[in-house]
Amino acid sequence: MTYEYIPKLIRAALNNDRKNVEAIALLMGRKLRREDPGISEEIMRALACVNTGASVMRSIDISPLPVDKETRNQLAKVDEPLKIEAPILQADVYNQLNEFLRERQLIDKFLEQDIIPPNSILLYGKPGVGKTYIAKWLSYMLNMPLVTLDLASAISSYLGRSGQNIKSLFEFTKSQNVILFLDEIDAIAKKRDDASDLGELKRLVNVLLKELEDCPVTCVIIGATNHPELLDRAIWRRFDREINVSMPALDQRKELLLRGLGSYGSEISKNVFDILLKGTQDFSAADICKMCEHIKRKAVLYPEKNFSICALMEYCELMHPQKKEEKIKICKLLKSCGECESLKSISEITGIPTSSVDRYLK
C-alpha cells in the first residue's frame, strides 16, 4: 500500500516543493504498478509531461489553456471531475438535469437519426442556490473536466481584446473533451441597448452569440447568472435548456440540514431541528450548509453543551433580533423548545439580559 506517502506528498505540494512532489509521485507510481496499474500509468504520464516541459494537463489529454496576449494570464482554470454528492434541488430542476445527462449518454443515437443532441444549459437563480455545484456535479457525472472562464483575465481594457479572448477560449473548448463553464455570464452577455456603450459590449455579445451557435455537439457549455434580467435576449435562444434554480423549499431544506449536520444529526432534538427547518425559509442552500458548519464548530468549541444548545446559539446569532417584538418571539421560541430550562440559559443563548427575558416571557 502507498498510504504512507500521501501525507508527505500533501506537505510537499503545500510547501511548493516541486522536486519532492515529483520524487514521491515517482515512488507511488512504482509501488502501484502491481496493485493498480491504471493509477500507476496515470501518475507516470503526469510525470512524463512535466519532465518534457509540457503542461501536466496533457497527461489527461487536455491541451494548454489559452492565455491573454498582453498579460499572459490563463483565460480559464481547469478542474478535473471529482466525485461529489448529487445536489439537493427541487424535483423539476433535478429532473431536467437528469434528462440532460440521459440525452448526453444517447448522443450517438440522436446523431444516427439526424437529431441534434443538446449541449448547453443556462442556469439562473439567486446567489447560493447551487449553480456552481451543479456544474461540478455534471462534470463528475459526464466525466469531463470543468473549464471555468476567468473573468478577471478574459475581460480586457484594450479594444477588441475581450472578444478575442472569448473566441480563443471557445476554440480551445471545441478541440477538447471538456465542459466550458461561463460563470457570471451576464458580465459578457449584457443587453445591447446601453446608450452609453461605445460598441465594445455589443462586439463582445456578438462574438459570444456566434461562438455559442458554432459549438459542435461534442462540447458542453454551461452558463450561470444571478441576474437573468441583464442578459441579452438573443443569449437565451442559444442555450438548449434554461433552468431556474430556485431557493430550497421545505423538503430540500430538511435534506440539506440532515446532510450538513452529518453524524451530529442524531444528537439534535426534534423541536430544535424544527426551529432550524422553519427558520431557514429564506436561506439559500449555501446559507444552510454554512450554518451547519458553524453549528458543528460550536459543538467542538463548547463540548460541555449539548448539540441542540449549540444549534440554538448559532440560530440566534443568525436571526440577530433587534426589535422588541423579535426578541419576545425568540425568547418564547426558546422557552417552548424544551432545551432552555431557565431564564439564565435563554439569556446566555440570546445575549438578552435576564431581566428582559423575564419581562418578555410574561
What are these regions (language model features)?
Residues D92-Q96, R102-N271:
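Walker A/P-loop NTP-binding motif of AAA+ ATPase domains
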